[in-house]
Structure formats: C-alpha cells, structure tokens
Amino acid sequence: MRKLTNFCFAGLILLGLSLAMCSEQPASKSATAVCDTLEASTPQQALAKLMAGNERYVAGQGIHPRSGMDRVAETAPHQAPFAGVVGCSDSRVPVELLFDQGIGDIFVIRTAGNNVNSESVMGSVDYAIEHLGVKVLLVLGHGSCGGVTGAISEGHEEHGNIGQLLGTIRNDVPQYVGKADSLDSAIRHHARVQVERILAYPHVAQKVQKGELLVKRAYYDVNTGKVTVD
C-alpha cells in the first residue's frame, strides 16, 4: 500500500512539473500540440497561432488557454489582442472557441453575413487595426450562411431591416442570385468582397504593404470545424 501511495505521489509531482513546463518554457514543435506558447509578434506568426488553435479544436485537443480568472484580472485594465476577426452572427461560429484562444486574444466583430458594408463596422475594423494593433485580420465566412442564403434566393422577400440587410449582401454577389446550388461559392465570394472593401482604405493597404498587417479571407466549415485561409 505504501509503495502504491509513493507511486501516486510521484506521478502527481511529474504532472505538476509538466504543466509548469507547458506554461513557462518556449514552445517546440511537439509542445504546440498541447501548449499554446506560439509567438504572435508578426502577422505571419499571428496567423500561424490562429491556425494552430483551429487544428487543436478540430482534433478535439482544445486547451482553452487564458480563460481563467487570472486572465480576467490581467486584461481588466487594457486589451491587446493579436488578431481581429470579422465573423458572422451565426450561433454556430464561436470565434474564440474554434481558434482555441482565450480572453483578450481576438478582437471579434460579428455581423450578419460577416458584412463590412457600413461605417459602424468599418469603424470597429479601424479600431482593431489602428488602436489595438492587431497583426492579422480575417474575414470569416462560413458554410450554410443564412445571410448569403437569403440574399441569393429568389421568390422569397423580406421586408424592413432584414430586407435591407439581404439587399446589401445581394449587391455584393449579384452573379449568384437564383443559384442556390452555388451557395458555397457565393459565401466565399462575399467574404472576398469584404476583404477587398477593407483593403481599399489607404491606411489599411499601407500597413499591409509595410508588412505590419495581414488581411485575409477565411472559411469555416460548420460540418468539420475546420478553418481554411486564402
């Protein structure tokens, strides 16, 4: 019995040492699958950090980093997210979860259809880029997007605010109206239009040209949980 107790105690010590190494030591290729210690000081590193998190999420190995009360206290005085994501309001697209990131890591802007065609949304994008200094900004479209579905549908009219929203999206994907079988292509194209809209602002384009920022289109597969970026 004493030997078993000593063995269990030694196991607990080793587990504690492993967790300490995970939180304190620089990441190696083998460690990144368990720990989220990747740097995000450059746009390329920031994107790699997001994609590594999504790989963990898809594999069912999410570690939910920086999500405890200590992180709440750390970020209370200020925020310094390394990434920004313009995502959809859809409840199936939980940005921090699908990238396996924590509190204060991602500045998230969610609108129906991940639409950037308004001053208020672009103001939020500017805030992320100019004031918070995010290194990467993704426009994240997703499969089965209701906003794009409604926008390209024929024979079904919405009125009021919803109708206005769908009309805005429809203007960005006119070639797909009436082509329900091309929904996925329409979703991806719509996200591309939003990226182009953001890059049309000179101050954003300048940061990209200087290598200080990446602005990319991304797509979230609601069936697999996987994010692809192009």
Residues covered by each model-derived region:
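Bacterial N-terminal signal peptides
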Residues: 10-20
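Bacterial N-terminal signal peptides that target proteins for export
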Residues: 1-9
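Catalytic core of membrane glycerolipid acyltransferases/transacylases, capturing the structured
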Residues: 92-109
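Conserved functional hotspot residues or short segments at active or partner-binding sites
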Residues: 139
